[in-house]
Amino acid sequence: MSTETFFALSYTSNHGEQVPLAQFAGQPVLVVNTASKCGFTPQYEGLEQLHETFASRGLVLIGFPCDQFGHQEPGSDTEIEEFCRLNFGVTFPLSTKVEVNGSGTHPVFSFLRKQAETSLGSLIKWNFTKFLVAPDGRTVKRYAPTVTPAEIADDIEALLPHP
């Protein structure tokens, strides 16, 4: 069994900076593969609401734009950020565009898929699949694209410190 945790990984921000996930150790992290031209794109609004509600208590939310499903994220990193900010008021961090399946799968998604394999396998089926990583960096819960951000608020709440 691997001793690797989510917090041993890193990603590249949409501004080109390397972001070590170790800086978020001990905090819950919600990871979402996103797209700007998808039927689920309006979930950006709900994700931003989760970010605004829970960030001050420790939730980290990261969007990972992906163009692997129906070519629904064709823009550049700058265009994606502008679209998210202007249309949905997104303030949570975004990565550079990544792959979530196949030989080019980003290490974050390789880890998450392995930790939260479903009865249907580990492949991500569509945009806006969500992964909630517990503060231990090992426990991961996976949510289908059809699960709205509001529907996972209680699971997030359960991982946050209570005043």
Please annotate each region the language model reported.
Residues 1-163:
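Chalcogenol-based redox active-site neighborhoods
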